[in-house]
């Protein structure tokens, strides 16, 4: 599969963008010329120079340093959240497809209830109850979006349940746990990985949306969404303060989406031909 990915330009571009963002997130303290939260009002709205390569914001904070540290929040929250959602989706979704009509009906109705409300509204409500904090942001995103993951896994699982290899496994006396982990999950995993890879972008955008609205993170946190919010007052005089974090969000989301599309074309070629 790696060989096939390397033959696709969109996969290479996507992987390069993802790698750059991850390296920046890990090495932000090394690359940052200043403390991202250091306020220096005497340098307010300073123009780019050797000391401040991208200038400063309304409080004299180094824009480049804040952008570099912003990658830590976007990646550091989104990837663990996607891992948790993937585990929940795989376990609950496959259980729903295998456990019988009553359990399946209950889980389906529960998912429909959550999906009926916009994910952002649910997440905002959860943050309102739990308060600020990185853990609370992660919890709110999980609560707001778990139903989508369960639903998509259940859909894949139901399609597989009628196939011959599943029927053969049942006839041979395979119990539900063995059926799920040995037969069902390995066969739906390629499709699910495609869904997860494109879901990273949505998670990053949701986290940035919280910060833009002033939710979840303390004031002054160097996060891309928060930087967009802070720069609104300087929209016309210093538009670059909005362009920089907006571009970071766009590039990161585009990297994961490009990689997800390439992965889909390889693992699910039947959809690409439609």
Where are these regions (language model features)?
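Non-cytoplasmic
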Residues: 124, 133-138, 142, 148-152, ...
